[in-house]
Amino acid sequence: GFLTHPELSAESPDGVSGNYGILDQIEALNWIQKNIAQFGGDPDNVTIFGQSAGGGSVKTLCESPLARGKFHKAIIMSAGGITVPDERASSRGRVSMTLAQSEQQSKEIFDWAGLTDLKKMRAAGTETVYALSTIYNAASGKRAYMTGSPVVDGHVCLKSFDDAAVSGTLADVPYMIGYTLNDMGNMAPGVAAFALD
């Protein structure tokens, strides 16, 4: 849902790539607006809810101009908070990559693997593409990733949730923000063993 690459952006009518997962969610909200009344629902009282990565999706929907007016309340659970400015400025504190940053990393990884055009990338298959970042990082000693999360692309996502919150441009809806017990607890051993640079 979030793969970026300059050639994917070039073939897009909007000139961007990535954020496909968010576009799918926006399309689901469009469907709800058109059809939910037939099931007894109220298209003027739609609440979006997400936990962990789903909470990250809710944060992106709250920032995206393409989702405006399609929901009326938002619940965000265990999706991180708003980082302080000093952390936002650092690479570790960066909440959202820009499209250009994400495309650069994806292109670097694909080029390294010899997948230098869309035809080769598409022929490689999902499993190969999914494993490339891990293989590339192990072979190169780098920490480059083909993003698995939304990017600031100037179309679907204009700025990070943090920056939108600070500038007051998030969706003007009631929010419930919290956390769940033991979110990502199964990943704790791996996180604890991860060496920070």
Residue ranges and their predicted role:
Residues 32, 39-52:
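Alpha/beta-hydrolase fold nucleophile elbow
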Residues 41-44, 71, 115-118:
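Short secondary-structure junction motifs
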Residues 1-26, 34-38, 86-90:
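Cap/lid segment of the alpha/beta-hydrolase catalytic domain
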Residues 29, 59-63:
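Short, hydrophobic alpha-helix immediately C-terminal to the catalytic nucleophile
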Residues 36, 65-66:
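Active-site catalytic pocket residues across diverse enzymes, especially alpha/beta-hydrolases
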Residues 59, 68, 77-78, 82-197:
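Substrate-access "cap/lid" subdomains that shape
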Residues 54-58:
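Catalytic nucleophile loop
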